[in-house]
Amino acid sequence: MAGPNQLCIRRWTTKHVAVWLKDEGFFEYVDILCNKHRLDGITLLTLTEYDLRSPPLEIKVLGDIKRLMLSVRKLQKIHIDVLEEMGYNSDSPMGSMTPFISALQSTDWLCNGELSHDCDGPITDLNSDQYQYMNGKNKHSVRRLDPEYWKTILSCIYVFIVFGFTSFIMVIVHERVPDMQTYPPLPDIFLDSVPRIPWAFAMTEVCGMILCYIWLLVLLLHKHRSILLRRLCSLMGTVFLLRCFTMFVTSLSVPGQHLQCTGKIYGSVWEKLHRAFAIWSGFGMTLTGVHTCGDYMFSGHTVVLTMLNFFVTEYTPRSWNFLHTLSWVLNLFGIFFILAAHEHYSIDVFIAFYITTRLFLYYHTLANTRAYQQSRRARIWFPMFSFFECNVNGTVPNEYCWPFSKPAIMKRLIG
Protein backbone atom coordinates (compact mmCIF):
# COMPACT_ATOMS: atom_id res chain seq x y z
CA MET A 1 0.00 0.00 0.00
CA ALA A 2 1.33 3.44 -0.96
CA GLY A 3 2.09 5.73 1.94
CA PRO A 4 -0.07 8.80 2.65
CA ASN A 5 2.60 11.18 1.37
CA GLN A 6 2.62 9.43 -2.02
CA LEU A 7 -1.15 9.46 -2.52
CA CYS A 8 -3.67 12.25 -3.10
CA ILE A 9 -5.61 12.89 0.08
CA ARG A 10 -8.87 12.37 -1.80
CA ARG A 11 -7.92 8.68 -2.06
CA TRP A 12 -6.85 8.22 1.54
CA THR A 13 -8.66 5.37 3.27
CA THR A 14 -8.91 4.78 7.00
CA LYS A 15 -5.66 2.82 6.74
CA HIS A 16 -3.83 5.81 5.28
CA VAL A 17 -5.22 8.02 8.05
CA ALA A 18 -4.01 5.49 10.62
CA VAL A 19 -0.51 5.63 9.15
CA TRP A 20 -0.61 9.43 9.23
CA LEU A 21 -1.72 9.45 12.88
CA LYS A 22 1.11 7.12 13.84
CA ASP A 23 3.63 9.26 11.97
CA GLU A 24 2.38 12.30 13.88
CA GLY A 25 2.63 10.49 17.21
CA PHE A 26 -1.07 9.86 17.95
CA PHE A 27 -1.02 6.05 18.30
CA GLU A 28 -3.71 6.03 21.01
CA TYR A 29 -6.27 7.70 18.74
CA VAL A 30 -5.95 5.35 15.76
CA ASP A 31 -8.60 2.99 17.07
CA ILE A 32 -11.24 5.61 17.93
CA LEU A 33 -10.73 7.74 14.82
CA CYS A 34 -10.02 5.13 12.15
CA ASN A 35 -11.58 1.87 13.34
CA LYS A 36 -14.57 3.16 15.28
CA HIS A 37 -15.47 6.38 13.44
CA ARG A 38 -13.93 5.51 10.04
CA LEU A 39 -12.13 8.78 9.29
CA ASP A 40 -10.78 8.88 5.72
CA GLY A 41 -8.73 11.60 4.00
CA ILE A 42 -11.56 14.00 3.19
CA THR A 43 -13.20 13.76 6.61
CA LEU A 44 -9.80 14.23 8.27
CA LEU A 45 -9.40 17.53 6.41
CA THR A 46 -12.71 18.81 7.79
CA LEU A 47 -11.94 17.80 11.37
CA THR A 48 -12.28 20.67 13.87
CA GLU A 49 -11.37 21.26 17.48
CA TYR A 50 -15.07 21.29 18.27
CA ASP A 51 -15.34 17.75 16.87
CA LEU A 52 -12.55 16.57 19.17
CA ARG A 53 -14.11 18.11 22.27
CA SER A 54 -17.72 17.12 21.57
CA PRO A 55 -19.51 13.76 21.40
CA PRO A 56 -18.88 11.16 20.16
CA LEU A 57 -15.09 11.71 20.48
CA GLU A 58 -14.92 13.81 23.69
CA ILE A 59 -11.14 13.76 24.02
CA LYS A 60 -10.31 14.85 27.57
CA VAL A 61 -6.60 15.69 27.23
CA LEU A 62 -6.23 19.34 26.24
CA GLY A 63 -2.63 18.96 25.06
CA ASP A 64 -3.59 16.11 22.73
CA ILE A 65 -6.45 18.19 21.32
CA LYS A 66 -4.15 21.13 20.59
CA ARG A 67 -1.35 19.00 19.13
CA LEU A 68 -3.74 17.02 16.95
CA MET A 69 -5.36 20.21 15.66
CA LEU A 70 -1.95 21.69 14.84
CA SER A 71 -1.17 18.63 12.73
CA VAL A 72 -4.59 18.79 11.05
CA ARG A 73 -4.12 22.48 10.31
CA LYS A 74 -0.78 21.76 8.63
CA LEU A 75 -2.51 19.13 6.54
CA GLN A 76 -5.29 21.56 5.64
CA LYS A 77 -2.80 24.17 4.44
CA ILE A 78 -1.04 21.61 2.27
CA HIS A 79 -4.36 20.57 0.69
CA ILE A 80 -6.01 24.01 0.61
CA ASP A 81 -7.10 23.46 -3.00
CA VAL A 82 -9.13 20.40 -2.03
CA LEU A 83 -10.87 22.33 0.74
CA GLU A 84 -11.69 25.23 -1.57
CA GLU A 85 -13.18 22.89 -4.16
CA MET A 86 -15.45 21.50 -1.45
CA GLY A 87 -16.55 25.03 -0.51
CA TYR A 88 -14.89 25.21 2.90
CA ASN A 89 -13.06 28.18 4.36
CA SER A 90 -9.83 27.04 5.97
CA ASP A 91 -8.79 30.45 7.31
CA SER A 92 -11.31 30.82 10.10
CA PRO A 93 -9.96 30.84 13.68
CA MET A 94 -9.54 27.83 15.95
CA GLY A 95 -9.31 25.51 12.97
CA SER A 96 -13.04 25.66 12.42
CA MET A 97 -14.19 24.93 8.89
CA THR A 98 -17.10 27.20 8.05
CA PRO A 99 -19.09 26.09 5.03
CA PHE A 100 -20.29 28.76 2.69
CA ILE A 101 -23.74 27.25 2.50
CA SER A 102 -24.83 29.27 5.51
CA ALA A 103 -23.46 32.42 3.92
CA LEU A 104 -25.40 31.78 0.75
CA GLN A 105 -28.57 31.12 2.69
CA SER A 106 -28.18 34.34 4.64
CA THR A 107 -27.70 36.19 1.36
CA ASP A 108 -31.01 34.89 0.08
CA TRP A 109 -33.09 36.33 2.85
CA LEU A 110 -31.07 39.53 2.88
CA CYS A 111 -31.61 39.82 -0.85
CA ASN A 112 -35.35 39.53 -0.31
CA GLY A 113 -35.25 42.36 2.20
CA GLU A 114 -36.18 40.32 5.26
CA LEU A 115 -33.51 41.63 7.59
CA SER A 116 -33.53 40.42 11.16
CA HIS A 117 -31.77 43.51 12.52
CA ASP A 118 -31.86 47.26 12.17
CA CYS A 119 -31.16 48.10 8.53
CA ASP A 120 -29.44 51.35 9.43
CA GLY A 121 -27.41 49.87 12.27
CA PRO A 122 -23.70 49.14 12.20
CA ILE A 123 -22.44 46.88 9.47
CA THR A 124 -21.09 43.62 10.82
CA ASP A 125 -19.19 40.66 9.44
CA LEU A 126 -18.27 42.42 6.21
CA ASN A 127 -14.62 41.70 6.88
CA SER A 128 -15.10 38.09 7.87
CA ASP A 129 -13.21 35.38 6.05
CA GLN A 130 -16.06 34.48 3.79
CA TYR A 131 -15.80 37.86 2.07
CA GLN A 132 -12.02 38.28 2.05
CA TYR A 133 -10.69 38.44 -1.49
CA MET A 134 -8.44 40.60 -3.64
CA ASN A 135 -8.27 40.19 -7.40
CA GLY A 136 -4.73 39.32 -8.35
CA LYS A 137 -2.17 37.27 -6.49
CA ASN A 138 -3.88 36.96 -3.10
CA LYS A 139 -5.86 33.89 -2.16
CA HIS A 140 -9.62 34.18 -1.96
CA SER A 141 -12.41 32.21 -0.43
CA VAL A 142 -14.46 30.10 -2.78
CA ARG A 143 -18.08 31.02 -3.27
CA ARG A 144 -20.75 29.65 -5.52
CA LEU A 145 -21.59 32.37 -8.02
CA ASP A 146 -24.85 31.72 -9.80
CA PRO A 147 -24.60 32.98 -13.42
CA GLU A 148 -28.35 33.83 -13.49
CA TYR A 149 -28.50 33.91 -17.27
CA TRP A 150 -32.01 35.33 -17.32
CA LYS A 151 -30.77 38.47 -15.55
CA THR A 152 -27.93 38.75 -18.04
CA ILE A 153 -30.44 38.56 -20.89
CA LEU A 154 -32.49 41.32 -19.23
CA SER A 155 -29.39 43.51 -18.92
CA CYS A 156 -28.59 42.97 -22.61
CA ILE A 157 -32.14 43.95 -23.55
CA TYR A 158 -31.80 47.01 -21.30
CA VAL A 159 -28.61 48.25 -22.94
CA PHE A 160 -29.93 47.64 -26.48
CA ILE A 161 -33.06 49.64 -25.67
CA VAL A 162 -30.93 52.45 -24.21
CA PHE A 163 -28.71 52.48 -27.30
CA GLY A 164 -31.80 52.70 -29.48
CA PHE A 165 -33.20 55.52 -27.35
CA THR A 166 -29.84 57.30 -27.49
CA SER A 167 -29.86 57.06 -31.29
CA PHE A 168 -33.32 58.62 -31.41
CA ILE A 169 -32.23 61.45 -29.09
CA MET A 170 -29.24 62.06 -31.37
CA VAL A 171 -31.66 62.54 -34.26
CA ILE A 172 -33.65 65.04 -32.19
CA VAL A 173 -30.60 67.06 -31.14
CA HIS A 174 -29.39 67.12 -34.76
CA GLU A 175 -32.55 69.04 -35.60
CA ARG A 176 -31.79 71.52 -32.83
CA VAL A 177 -28.07 72.05 -33.46
CA PRO A 178 -27.27 75.80 -33.22
CA ASP A 179 -26.54 77.67 -36.45
CA MET A 180 -22.78 77.91 -36.95
CA GLN A 181 -22.95 81.51 -38.22
CA THR A 182 -24.93 82.73 -35.22
CA TYR A 183 -23.26 80.53 -32.60
CA PRO A 184 -19.54 80.02 -33.34
CA PRO A 185 -17.47 77.41 -31.46
CA LEU A 186 -17.09 78.07 -27.75
CA PRO A 187 -13.66 78.99 -26.36
CA ASP A 188 -11.74 75.87 -25.35
CA ILE A 189 -8.18 75.84 -24.03
CA PHE A 190 -7.20 72.53 -25.63
CA LEU A 191 -8.94 73.03 -28.97
CA ASP A 192 -7.55 76.57 -29.26
CA SER A 193 -4.03 75.36 -28.50
CA VAL A 194 -3.78 72.14 -30.51
CA PRO A 195 -4.21 72.16 -34.31
CA ARG A 196 -6.76 69.76 -35.73
CA ILE A 197 -5.56 66.35 -36.95
CA PRO A 198 -8.03 65.14 -39.63
CA TRP A 199 -7.39 61.40 -39.18
CA ALA A 200 -7.40 61.47 -35.38
CA PHE A 201 -11.06 60.56 -34.85
CA ALA A 202 -10.69 57.42 -36.96
CA MET A 203 -7.77 56.44 -34.72
CA THR A 204 -10.02 56.89 -31.69
CA GLU A 205 -12.41 54.32 -33.08
CA VAL A 206 -9.51 51.98 -33.92
CA CYS A 207 -8.39 52.19 -30.28
CA GLY A 208 -11.95 51.44 -29.21
CA MET A 209 -12.18 48.41 -31.50
CA ILE A 210 -8.89 46.98 -30.18
CA LEU A 211 -10.11 47.43 -26.60
CA CYS A 212 -13.40 45.80 -27.56
CA TYR A 213 -11.66 42.74 -29.04
CA ILE A 214 -9.49 42.41 -25.93
CA TRP A 215 -12.55 42.60 -23.70
CA LEU A 216 -14.45 40.04 -25.78
CA LEU A 217 -11.54 37.62 -25.42
CA VAL A 218 -11.43 38.16 -21.64
CA LEU A 219 -15.20 37.74 -21.46
CA LEU A 220 -15.10 34.55 -23.52
CA LEU A 221 -12.50 32.88 -21.33
CA HIS A 222 -13.67 34.16 -17.93
CA LYS A 223 -15.40 31.55 -15.79
CA HIS A 224 -18.02 34.06 -14.58
CA ARG A 225 -18.67 35.63 -17.97
CA SER A 226 -22.40 35.94 -17.34
CA ILE A 227 -21.88 38.20 -14.32
CA LEU A 228 -19.29 40.29 -16.18
CA LEU A 229 -21.54 40.80 -19.19
CA ARG A 230 -24.45 41.71 -16.92
CA ARG A 231 -22.37 44.34 -15.14
CA LEU A 232 -21.07 45.80 -18.40
CA CYS A 233 -24.56 46.09 -19.88
CA SER A 234 -26.09 47.63 -16.77
CA LEU A 235 -23.30 50.19 -16.36
CA MET A 236 -23.07 51.05 -20.05
CA GLY A 237 -26.82 51.42 -20.33
CA THR A 238 -27.03 53.66 -17.27
CA VAL A 239 -24.25 55.99 -18.44
CA PHE A 240 -25.76 56.33 -21.92
CA LEU A 241 -29.19 56.97 -20.41
CA LEU A 242 -27.66 59.88 -18.50
CA ARG A 243 -26.02 61.01 -21.74
CA CYS A 244 -29.42 61.12 -23.42
CA PHE A 245 -30.62 63.56 -20.77
CA THR A 246 -27.59 65.87 -21.01
CA MET A 247 -27.72 65.91 -24.83
CA PHE A 248 -31.42 66.69 -24.89
CA VAL A 249 -31.61 69.49 -22.32
CA THR A 250 -28.71 71.61 -23.63
CA SER A 251 -27.49 72.01 -27.21
CA LEU A 252 -23.91 73.23 -27.45
CA SER A 253 -22.56 74.96 -30.52
CA VAL A 254 -20.41 72.95 -32.92
CA PRO A 255 -16.79 72.71 -31.62
CA GLY A 256 -15.17 73.31 -35.02
CA GLN A 257 -15.87 74.90 -38.41
CA HIS A 258 -14.69 71.75 -40.16
CA LEU A 259 -17.80 69.83 -39.06
CA GLN A 260 -20.21 71.84 -41.22
CA CYS A 261 -23.21 70.91 -39.11
CA THR A 262 -26.62 72.39 -39.81
CA GLY A 263 -29.97 71.62 -38.28
CA LYS A 264 -31.56 68.82 -40.26
CA ILE A 265 -35.32 68.51 -40.15
CA TYR A 266 -36.80 65.04 -40.56
CA GLY A 267 -40.32 65.18 -41.92
CA SER A 268 -42.06 62.32 -40.14
CA VAL A 269 -41.59 60.07 -37.17
CA TRP A 270 -40.77 57.19 -39.50
CA GLU A 271 -37.90 59.16 -41.04
CA LYS A 272 -36.56 59.87 -37.57
CA LEU A 273 -36.83 56.22 -36.63
CA HIS A 274 -35.10 55.20 -39.86
CA ARG A 275 -32.24 57.59 -39.14
CA ALA A 276 -32.07 56.39 -35.51
CA PHE A 277 -31.86 52.79 -36.70
CA ALA A 278 -28.99 53.72 -39.04
CA ILE A 279 -27.10 55.26 -36.10
CA TRP A 280 -27.93 52.31 -33.84
CA SER A 281 -26.90 49.65 -36.37
CA GLY A 282 -23.68 51.53 -37.17
CA PHE A 283 -22.79 51.84 -33.46
CA GLY A 284 -22.54 55.61 -33.92
CA MET A 285 -19.09 55.20 -35.51
CA THR A 286 -17.70 57.21 -38.41
CA LEU A 287 -15.90 54.05 -39.61
CA THR A 288 -19.34 52.58 -40.37
CA GLY A 289 -20.47 55.72 -42.18
CA VAL A 290 -22.42 57.33 -39.33
CA HIS A 291 -22.04 61.11 -38.98
CA THR A 292 -23.91 62.99 -36.27
CA CYS A 293 -24.11 66.54 -34.97
CA GLY A 294 -25.13 68.06 -31.67
CA ASP A 295 -24.34 65.11 -29.38
CA TYR A 296 -21.65 66.90 -27.43
CA MET A 297 -22.43 66.73 -23.72
CA PHE A 298 -20.92 64.25 -23.06
CA SER A 299 -18.62 62.12 -25.28
CA GLY A 300 -19.96 58.65 -25.99
CA HIS A 301 -16.63 57.51 -27.44
CA THR A 302 -14.90 58.42 -24.17
CA VAL A 303 -17.50 56.45 -22.22
CA VAL A 304 -16.93 53.31 -24.29
CA LEU A 305 -13.13 53.58 -24.20
CA THR A 306 -13.03 54.16 -20.45
CA MET A 307 -15.60 51.51 -19.57
CA LEU A 308 -13.84 48.83 -21.63
CA ASN A 309 -10.48 49.79 -20.12
CA PHE A 310 -11.78 49.49 -16.57
CA PHE A 311 -13.46 46.16 -17.22
CA VAL A 312 -10.32 44.72 -18.83
CA THR A 313 -8.10 45.82 -15.93
CA GLU A 314 -10.60 44.77 -13.24
CA TYR A 315 -11.28 41.27 -14.53
CA THR A 316 -7.75 40.19 -15.37
CA PRO A 317 -5.06 39.28 -12.80
CA ARG A 318 -2.92 42.12 -11.49
CA SER A 319 0.21 40.33 -12.67
CA TRP A 320 -0.83 40.90 -16.30
CA ASN A 321 1.00 44.22 -16.38
CA PHE A 322 1.47 44.32 -20.14
CA LEU A 323 -2.25 43.95 -20.83
CA HIS A 324 -3.16 46.60 -18.25
CA THR A 325 -0.59 49.02 -19.65
CA LEU A 326 -1.85 48.42 -23.18
CA SER A 327 -5.44 48.96 -22.06
CA TRP A 328 -4.62 52.29 -20.41
CA VAL A 329 -2.54 53.44 -23.37
CA LEU A 330 -5.43 52.72 -25.75
CA ASN A 331 -7.84 54.53 -23.42
CA LEU A 332 -5.71 57.65 -23.01
CA PHE A 333 -4.62 57.83 -26.65
CA GLY A 334 -8.22 57.38 -27.73
CA ILE A 335 -9.25 60.34 -25.56
CA PHE A 336 -6.38 62.42 -26.94
CA PHE A 337 -7.39 61.63 -30.52
CA ILE A 338 -10.97 62.77 -29.79
CA LEU A 339 -9.66 66.18 -28.74
CA ALA A 340 -7.04 66.28 -31.50
CA ALA A 341 -9.79 65.73 -34.07
CA HIS A 342 -11.77 68.66 -32.55
CA GLU A 343 -14.87 66.45 -32.45
CA HIS A 344 -15.74 67.28 -28.82
CA TYR A 345 -15.09 70.03 -26.35
CA SER A 346 -12.61 69.28 -23.58
CA ILE A 347 -15.41 69.45 -21.00
CA ASP A 348 -17.29 66.72 -22.91
CA VAL A 349 -14.36 64.35 -22.55
CA PHE A 350 -13.65 65.27 -18.93
CA ILE A 351 -17.26 64.82 -17.81
CA ALA A 352 -17.54 61.51 -19.70
CA PHE A 353 -14.35 60.15 -18.12
CA TYR A 354 -15.35 61.30 -14.63
CA ILE A 355 -18.90 59.94 -14.74
CA THR A 356 -17.82 56.60 -16.21
CA THR A 357 -15.02 56.00 -13.72
CA ARG A 358 -17.08 57.10 -10.70
CA LEU A 359 -20.04 54.93 -11.65
CA PHE A 360 -17.79 51.92 -12.27
CA LEU A 361 -15.98 52.34 -8.94
CA TYR A 362 -19.14 53.00 -6.92
CA TYR A 363 -20.87 49.99 -8.45
CA HIS A 364 -18.00 47.63 -7.74
CA THR A 365 -17.42 49.02 -4.26
CA LEU A 366 -21.01 48.25 -3.34
CA ALA A 367 -20.90 44.85 -5.04
CA ASN A 368 -17.62 43.81 -3.41
CA THR A 369 -18.34 44.92 0.15
CA ARG A 370 -22.03 43.90 0.25
CA ALA A 371 -22.68 47.08 2.23
CA TYR A 372 -25.89 47.77 0.34
CA GLN A 373 -27.56 44.79 2.00
CA GLN A 374 -27.36 46.54 5.37
CA SER A 375 -29.39 49.56 4.30
CA ARG A 376 -32.94 49.78 3.03
CA ARG A 377 -32.18 53.20 1.57
CA ALA A 378 -29.50 51.70 -0.66
CA ARG A 379 -32.04 49.39 -2.26
CA ILE A 380 -34.34 52.36 -2.83
CA TRP A 381 -31.62 54.48 -4.46
CA PHE A 382 -30.04 51.64 -6.46
CA PRO A 383 -32.92 49.33 -7.42
CA MET A 384 -31.35 47.99 -10.62
CA PHE A 385 -28.06 47.32 -8.85
CA SER A 386 -29.86 45.47 -6.06
CA PHE A 387 -31.79 43.40 -8.59
CA PHE A 388 -28.74 42.37 -10.63
CA GLU A 389 -26.32 41.86 -7.72
CA CYS A 390 -28.44 40.46 -4.89
CA ASN A 391 -27.18 36.90 -5.39
CA VAL A 392 -23.54 37.73 -6.14
CA ASN A 393 -21.57 37.18 -2.94
CA GLY A 394 -18.59 39.50 -2.78
CA THR A 395 -15.83 40.01 -5.33
CA VAL A 396 -15.94 37.95 -8.51
CA PRO A 397 -12.68 35.93 -8.67
CA ASN A 398 -10.61 36.06 -11.83
CA GLU A 399 -10.91 32.43 -12.89
CA TYR A 400 -10.71 31.26 -16.48
CA CYS A 401 -11.91 28.21 -18.35
CA TRP A 402 -12.39 27.07 -21.92
CA PRO A 403 -16.05 27.77 -22.76
CA PHE A 404 -16.50 25.05 -25.37
CA SER A 405 -16.64 21.31 -24.96
CA LYS A 406 -13.60 19.40 -26.19
CA PRO A 407 -13.98 17.49 -29.47
CA ALA A 408 -14.07 13.72 -29.11
CA ILE A 409 -10.67 13.29 -30.78
CA MET A 410 -9.09 15.77 -28.34
CA LYS A 411 -10.64 13.97 -25.38
CA ARG A 412 -9.06 10.72 -26.58
CA LEU A 413 -5.67 12.36 -27.05
CA ILE A 414 -5.44 14.15 -23.70
CA GLY A 415 -7.68 11.87 -21.70
Swiss-Prot record:
Annotated S-S bridges: none
Molecular function per GO: ceramide cholinephosphotransferase activity; sphingomyelin synthase activity
Pfam (any one): PAP2_C
Catalytic reactions of this protein: an N-acylsphing-4-enine + a 1,2-diacyl-sn-glycero-3-phosphoethanolamine = an N-acylsphing-4-enine 1-phosphoethanolamine + a 1,2-diacyl-sn-glycerol; an N-acylsphinganine + a 1,2-diacyl-sn-glycero-3-phosphoethanolamine = an N-acylsphinganine-1-phosphoethanolamine + a 1,2-diacyl-sn-glycerol; an N-acyl-(4R)-4-hydroxysphinganine + a 1,2-diacyl-sn-glycero-3-phosphoethanolamine = an N-acyl-(4R)-4-hydroxysphinganine-1-phosphoethanolamine + a 1,2-diacyl-sn-glycerol; N-hexadecanoylsphinganine + a 1,2-diacyl-sn-glycero-3-phosphoethanolamine = N-hexadecanoyl-sphinganine-1-phosphoethanolamine + a 1,2-diacyl-sn-glycerol
Keywords, comma-separated and alphabetical: Endoplasmic reticulum, Lipid metabolism, Membrane, Sphingolipid metabolism, Transferase, Transmembrane, Transmembrane helix
Catalytic site positions: 301, 344, 348
BP-aspect Gene Ontology terms: ceramide biosynthetic process; regulation of ceramide biosynthetic process; sphingomyelin biosynthetic process
Primary localisation category: endoplasmic reticulum
Pathway given in the UniProt record: Sphingolipid metabolism
Membrane protein topology class: Multi-pass membrane protein
Residues passing through the membrane, by range: 153-173, 201-221, 232-252, 277-297, 322-342, 347-367
E.C. no: 2.7.8.-
Superkingdom of origin organism: Eukaryota
Residue ranges occupied by any SAM domain in the UniProt entry: 12-78
Enzyme class: transferase
Cytoplasmic-side positions: 368-415
InterPro entries according to UniProt: SAM, SAM/pointed_sf, Sphingomyelin_synth-like, Sphingomyelin_synth-like_dom
Any one annotated GO CC term: cytosol
This protein's domain notes: The SAM domain is required to retain SMAD8 in the endoplasmic reticulum.
Family: Belongs to the sphingomyelin synthase family.
Free-text function comment from the UniProt entry: Synthesizes sphingolipids through transfer of a phosphatidyl head group from a glycerophospholipid on to the primary hydroxyl of a ceramide in the lumen of the endoplasmic reticulum.
PANTHER family noted in UniProt: SPHINGOMYELIN SYNTHASE-RELATED PROTEIN 1, SPHINGOMYELIN SYNTHETASE
Protein name: Sphingomyelin synthase-related protein 1
Organism listed in the record: Homo sapiens (Human)
